[in-house]
Amino acid sequence: MIYYVNNSAPKNGNGTKEMPFKFINDAAKIAKAGDEVLVAPGIYHEYVDPVNGGTEDARIVYKSEKPLGAKITGAETMNDWEHYKDNVWVCRVDNGVFGNYNPYTTMVGGDWYFAPVVRHTGAVYLKDRQLYEAETLEECIKGEVYAPSWESEWSVYKWYTEQDKEKNQTVIYANFQGKNPTEEKVEINVRRNCFMPSKTGVNYITFSGFDVSKAATTWAPPAAYQDGMIGPHWSKGWIIEDCEVSNSKCCGISLGKYYDPENDHYFTRKHVKSPTQMERDAVCRGQYHGWTKENIGSHIIRRCHIHHCEQTGIVGRMGGVFSIIEDNHIHNINNMQQLGGAEISGIKMHAAIDVVMRRNHIHHCTMGIWCDWEAQGTRLTQNLLHDNCPPEGTPKAEGAMMSQDIFIEVGHGPTLIDNNIMLSPVSVRMATDGIACVHNLMLGSLTAVGGGTGDRYTPYHIRHRTEVAGFMTFLHGDDRFYNNIFIQNYPVEETETVEDMGFKMEDNQEVGTHVFDEYPTYDEWISHFELDKPADMSKLEPYHNKCHLPVWVNGNAYFNGAKACVNEKENLMDNENQVKVELVEKDGHYSIKTNVYEFLKDFRTGIINSDILGYAFEPEQRFEDPDGSTIIFDQDYLGEHRGVAAMPGPFADGAEAEKILW
């Protein structure tokens, strides 16, 4: 059955084409497996709470009749402003409009939140852009530049809020820098979510073609309920496609964790156990709460435009397993720098088990992709990442995170990074074990090698399942680097030891695989175990618990002073020619202008496959597809065939770099 929704209808109907519903949520209350909800263009000021799920063979489809024509917003228009002082205006809102959730009394904060807890989940928007929240009315009146902002010219637009308890009103002051808010498009967010079931287990929903914006979402760390403007809420088989997602206070789309009252922001509330311990507990408790391949995950997020959210574009802990995230454009995430903590990125996934992220364009984010804990069977492929770093000279905000294209943290692999274009100053931060980098172009460094893990021990899982197989600390290594291009594109400053999230790591800026010079080859490592003799537990204890795992490096090309690992036998090292790489944007399309292929000349390497990469050490799982099949790396960034020999980097032929990459 098709239900029709049109908020321009003269009155609320029964969902027929002749008498459509005025609200999407009216259809969401009754739609059942196999039904379609067709939504006419218009602005829908509502929270949609789907009651029923579909089945694998009979999905429930919510579709905008015109692509991006149906707009679901968490905000309300605010025109009732009075001039207060200088450029500052004031409005009052009766708190009844907020129901049981007032964004202007709810603070952003919780586990793994490092910035001062001074921001609210509420927001003021001028022409679809968030204003900066001030801590005091005086700061709002001054309207000065917020130095850590990545968009400093916009940071002079401020707002400040307080409560009038006698009148039960929220009072909002805003500095519009000379603009008259009664004549401009000004909104305030009032709803926490836009399209997300309030209960778990609402499966097999397709959400297609909507413009979703301006919700008062909350901080979403791994051992807590993770909400977004859109999200399946601990269910299976959703498709979120062809949507525009913007201006969430925290997260745009959540594939995240359910609410567990016994382990929700436990560290923040009780202090007596570390947030790391509670993350381990969350994994174990998830097994009890239905976290299996049969029940959870297997979602698809595709062809979405996600931007200007202040925590993540996409977030997920455990609920996103076995998912595909493809063909999305994600940019300008956390650019305001008013929120800070360990959960900020274009995509931030914990337990990305068998998750494939491919053909995404991610830029101008604090981080591009962050796979934290249990990146087992995770594959990042054919992504374009650039400008995931602050503007030059921008000071770091209190609680802000370091920047890079990809961060893999405290997982045991196998984590596969292949055929990507990484153009930011740091390509991969790797405080982890079990990574394979194959056929990438990297202009930035490999950093945090051998550090950033502390004494944490994290789970690994039964192959291609969620069930926990074991826990282990980090020996570091167990990494592979084949057929990559490394170019020292940015100036090098002296390596320094930095502390982030309480964990120390080397912040290396030199490009190349030389950071693994002290790591053993496989033959060196295996020789310690004396396989021809009886096992001696005390003698082997250091090699079980303290020594690095082996690293495999071969077939890479190095330019502009990028350095190779001492154990690499076959490579191309060119320190004579000056290689240039320029990302060219024209009419919204991107290509690369480079001379690197002039100097690669006839250097070729072998075709890599899953058997060459082998097995990640702790889970004893091969670098393979989620269905267990072999990967042969004979397709490049654009899907072109490589043939019997391979050129290093993401292209089968150098001429492809000048083609449209996005």
Say what each PLM segment does.
Residues N203-A216, K236-C250, D260-G286, T292-T312, ...:
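Right-handed parallel beta-helix
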Residues L423-V428, V438-I462, I487-P491, T495-M501, ...:
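Non-catalytic carbohydrate-binding regions of carbohydrate-active enzymes
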Residues I462-R463, L475:
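Long, structured stretches of catalytic cores involved in phosphate-ester chemistry, encompassing
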Residues G228-I230, T312, S345-G346:
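Predominantly extracellular/luminal carbohydrate-interaction, adhesion, and secreted-enzyme modules
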Residues M1-I2, E658-W662:
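N-terminal pre-domain segments of enzymes
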Residues L38, G231, G313-V315, I369-W370, ...:
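Short catalytic-loop micro-motif centered on adjacent basic/acidic residues
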Residues I2-W234, I239, E244-S246, G252-S254, ...:
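Extracellular polysaccharide-degrading/modifying enzymes targeting complex plant/algal/animal polysaccharides
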